[in-house]
UniProtKB/Swiss-Prot annotation:
Monomer. It comes from Glycine max (Soybean). This is Inositol-tetrakisphosphate 1-kinase 1. Mg(2+) 1 binds at residues 273, 288. InterPro entries: Inositol_tetrakis-P_1-kinase (IPR008656), InsP(3)kin_ATP-grasp (IPR040464), ITPK1_N (IPR041429). Mg(2+) 2 binds at residues 288, 290.
Amino acid sequence: MAEKRFGVIGYALAPKKQNSFIRDSLVSLAKSRGIELVRVDSDKPLADQGPFDCVLHKLYGDDWKRQLQEFHTLYPNAVILDAPEAIERLHNRISMLQVVSELRIEDRPETFGIPKQIVIYDKATLLDPQAWESLKFPVIAKPLVADGSAKSHKMALVFTRDALNKLKPPIVLQEFVNHGGVIFKVYVVGEHVRCVKRKSLPDVSDEEKALGGVSEDLMSFSQVSNLATVNDCDGYYRLMHLDDDTEMPPDAFVVDIAGGLRRALKLNLFNFDVIRDARYGNRYLIIDINYFPGYAKMPGYEAVLTQFFCEVMLKKKQQEEQQQEEGNAPKEKEESLQA
């Protein structure tokens, strides 16, 4: 008996992303639910391929945006995950976190926000003490652009004002907040939300702050998500997983934040990093938001993504049926009048 075909999803991903995300385990599980995952050939126009019920992508550039628009014109009912315009908001570390201020979560004891931060566009501003005098050191220096490139992941913990001249603008200076050396990574897949805890930068004591760091006034570090390669992803998870009794944020609180971000950003596939401010027991700070993160690092990602794909296909089918009914209604009325 032939397998029931629910939908075809074309995926357009960079080679590294494809290798880490499109695993045999995901392809097999999706196929068992009637979802076929098909690679988009980057050497051919998207509009000449398929047809696809959905395009799952993480490619950038004007040419790719044009291809998506042409595909949408040909197949207006096809689902694009996600809209390039919505994704681009996350490419700027200032605009990505501005959305947090738009959230309204009521009737909860927990509070949330973002660390104090400023953007420095040029060297002259960087060397002007008045530009950053409101910040308390240490600060984390991050490139303003967050486009997934290796350059965008180059960050540093800056302990002293004198170390600022080692940085290259445009950058964002974000106050470092002690958080117990634990970061909570919240994965969002449509309405599915999964929160895991990972090791983070250790707290900085008052003595270390006074001395300007342990041994250096500026300490470079790699973003945690870049530590793993495809081959050592499982080892990465074991390394970064915390077996201690660190308390997780309340599930309902995390789900509320995730839902608010999903609606405000108009995105389905992203994760956000949260820390618990060590100065307050129930104060949480969102420090980063990433589009289409490394879902393979999330335990059981295959089941979550497959269920999401099925939900996307079901919603698409329901919308098409509704459109068909609305399109037939005037015709049926006209025929009844003629009779």
